[in-house]
Amino acid sequence: MSSSRPRLHVRLHYEGATRPSLILEAGSLNVLDLSERGLRYRQEFGPEPALGAKLEGILRLTSGETLPVRGTVVRVMRPAKPEDASVIEVAAHLTDVGIPSRVILSERKALQEPPAH
């Protein structure tokens, strides 16, 4: 399903092992994608967050930099694969403070660089 509205912010998609982490009270979770005003993460344990639930934690970027994040859960999805039945993906809109554009640009550059050998 596509939206007729263009995205306001660049969204970075993380694949493979190099991903930012979202550190919440319940533990550290893998970030799947990130923009200045939102993020999506993978949760493999714990209770499913309710839509509208508040989210507060620390985002640890691939560079090692950490940023406080606060937001609201806007979507909860289950992967289509039956073997991943306990896994959920959670999307959150960042409310108070977003991710600075300099961080998004730095992360995008890091994603485009080939890994060091």
Task: Please identify what each model-predicted range represents.
Residues 27, 41-42, 54-57, 76:
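Short structured motifs
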Residues 16-22, 52-67:
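Short conserved beta-strand and strand-loop elements enriched in small hydrophobics
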Residues 10, 47-51, 63-65, 84-88:
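A generic structural micro-feature
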Residues 32, 80-117:
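C-terminal output/interaction extensions
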Residues 29, 69-76:
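Short beta-strand-centered aromatic/proline hotspots
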Residues 1-44, 48, 106-117:
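N-terminal helix initiation/capping motif
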Residues 9, 15, 38, 54-56, ...:
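Broad gene-expression machinery/nucleic-acid interaction feature
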Residues 33, 61, 73-75, 96:
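A residue-level detector for short acidic-glycine micro-motifs
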